[in-house]
Amino acid sequence: MSERGLLIVFSGPSGVGKGTVRQEIFSTPDHKFEYSVSMTTRPQRPGEVDGVDYFFRTREEFEELIKTGQMLEYAEYVGNYYGTPLTYVNETLDKGIDVFLEIEVQGALQVKSKVPDGVFVFLTPPDLDELEDRLVGRGTDSQEVIAQRIERAKEEIALMREYDYAVVNDEVALAAERVKRIIETEHFRVERVIGRYDKMIKITKNSFKAK
């Protein structure tokens, strides 16, 4: 049986560039990840594909999934639900494949309470002025919504201490490389590999006894 995969939880304030950095991480074949597509009730943006960028669902559909316990985590953010389907994540980890979750901060904290051995990475902007410039440059939100997102970002940055790692997104390629190094290092943590060697030692002892 293969070792259980790593659950990588990647989050940060709205507009920090999570999606762009995640795409950069996945653009090179040096590590195999399975990207867990999040579910949301927010409107689909131009160029987004259902089942690729997000699973887009109505509020009623989402609330039914919550009621039946089919979400690993969920959060309501600026009037919309975001969450992670549970079954897909567990099935993939059990196959020994790493699962990469790009989710909101509220959701990440829920996951940490359920899966404490996950790898929690917080993506930060260089500063709040840069974050506001990025939100304005997206051209998808009103000034009122942008102001709400900045206030929410301050609250989320204060929760950074709940994460294992913080990565500054000052340049996309560099930020992606930092995240990949973190994941590579996590695979070598003693508590993640000791089980394999415990089994090896047990098998060796049993073989000597048999002789």
Curated annotation (Swiss-Prot):
Record CDD domains: GMPK
Disulfide bond residue pairs: none
Annotated gene: gmk
Positions of the Guanylate kinase-like domain: 5-184
Catalytic activity reported: GMP + ATP = GDP + ADP
Localisation: Cytoplasm
Family recorded in the similarity comment: Belongs to the guanylate kinase family.
GO CC terms, sorted: cytosol
Gene3D superfamilies, sorted: Guanylate Kinase phosphate binding domain (3.30.63.10), P-loop containing nucleotide triphosphate hydrolases (3.40.50.300)
Binding residue positions for ATP: 12-19
Class of the enzyme per the UniProt entry, highest EC level: transferase
EC number(s) reported in the record: 2.7.4.8
UniProt-recorded name of the protein: Guanylate kinase
Function summary: Essential for recycling GMP and indirectly, cGMP.
HAMAP family: Guanylate_kinase
InterPro entries: GK/Ca_channel_bsu, Guanylate_kin-like_dom, Guanylate_kinase, Guanylate_kinase_CS, P-loop_NTPase
Main location group: cytoplasm
Keywords assigned: ATP-binding, Cytoplasm, Kinase, Nucleotide-binding, Transferase
One function term, GO molecular function aspect: ATP binding
